[in-house]
Amino acid sequence: MSLRPIMLTRPPVEIMLDDGFWDELIEGGFRDVCVSWMVFLKEVQSGERLPSHEEARPRVLSYFEDKGDQFKYVPIINPDDSLYDGLTLNPPTRSDEFDSIFGELRDAFQRAKEKGINLYLFDDKSYFEISGYPAGSEGDRGFSCWNNPQVAEYLVARTRDYVNQLPMFSGIVLDGPDYKWEIAPGERDDLFAECCACDHCQNAARAMGLDLMKLIDALAAFKLELQQLDDEKVRGFLLSTRGFLGAADWWLSHPELLDLLRFRYKTIEDHLVRNYEGIKNHLPEFEVMASSRTPSYSALSGHSLPRRSAYTDYQLPKLYLWAGNQPGFRYTVSNYVNTLSEWNPSLSRESVVALTERILGIEFPMDYPIEKFDGPAPSSFYEQVAGDEMRKMIHLTGDVDRLIPFIALEHFGGPQIQPQEVRDLLRTLEDSGINRYIFFHYGVITEDVWKVLTEFSE
């Protein structure tokens, strides 16, 4: 068993001051580490409650034992303002009280590098760290639309800033951005609720000869179409789209939806190209890795896996397979089935399941139907459904050696994937020919899961 994993970490970064943290990873076969949310924790009266529900690693839990339960995130670096000249987006600052511990952390990173660990930065949706939303011209901090070219310029400047102060880092993981892909109302990733019509989005559409408002209207019309189904319509759709050419008539009858996908592909690509070329212009040897969603709905999220090899060094599709909460694969599939059923009460269960399979390009194992998704998945799910997603990744990216899927146990409080499922997942990954993955994240790893991960490491 010889997978080469990347371990992604979250706060507290303070645990990294202890060489035992790095030694533990090395002993477990982890020689690549991506440090996400690179912030110090400051105890406050009202702030983020930590540790989170998902933390399980003893080293993480012990850090919080003699502390309060609310914290403020403090960026670990003070910015070099000259790097941000000309930008209306401004970086956060660090107070002087953290100067000493920053020096200690920098030394710890250097020792880790000397131990043979490769270190990677992490950017989450182009705001770089959880406390680092860039401030706009009014001083307010918050998410900025990635169709604003300055968002990429800010990311490039932030990357240079970190590398200047922490030169032992050799690459960066870009997490997103993504357009939405869910259909369940009220979900974070509900594609029908995502209707950004800012000037940057409208300008991007006009540059393609498109009217953004017409695309948004087409999305609303498609939702209405999904709410007016019957068994005869579904049977006809399944019959007429069975072959490769069969779907052509459907797409030609929905030209604005095809234009919407083109818009999503183009704007995500333009943003990632700006990131990639901007970083490489200043740091040509720096490795740039970029995430996407799993192939079944990567098109909805705006990522064209075959094209991305031109503007990423490694591709990191998210193989998030849990069932209990967003953005797990089984959770999304269940939402499609349940939402289509709620919208169309007269539809048979058979029609709903078959339609979901056709839309997402999946087939449920006979021994693990949708009704069982809340329980642990059998090996057949990982061999068939997860295995197909992996095979799609390999085919679409065209280079298995540049493929590093994300895997995780859960997100936002849902039931975790069980240790045996992790074993089935890693075995399927290995059997597919994929030899690397990135694990999200260190803090959630129980001893039973740790044993499984180390079984498969080099």
Name what the model sees in each region.
Residues R4-I15, D80-F102, E138-E153, H254-E269, ...:
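The substrate-binding groove and active-site-proximal loops of carbohydrate-active enzymes
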Residues Q70-P167, W181-M213, E269-V273:
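Active-site-adjacent "subsite" loops/lids of carbohydrate-active enzymes
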Residues N118-F128, V173-P177, M208-G243, D259-S301, ...:
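Aromatic-lined carbohydrate-recognition surfaces of secreted/lumenal glycan-active proteins
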Residues S131-G139, W181-I183, E285-F329, G414-S432:
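Substrate-binding cleft/loops of secretory-pathway carbohydrate-active enzymes
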Residues D175, A205, L215-L257, H303-P376, ...:
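Aromatic- and acid-rich polysaccharide-binding/catalytic face
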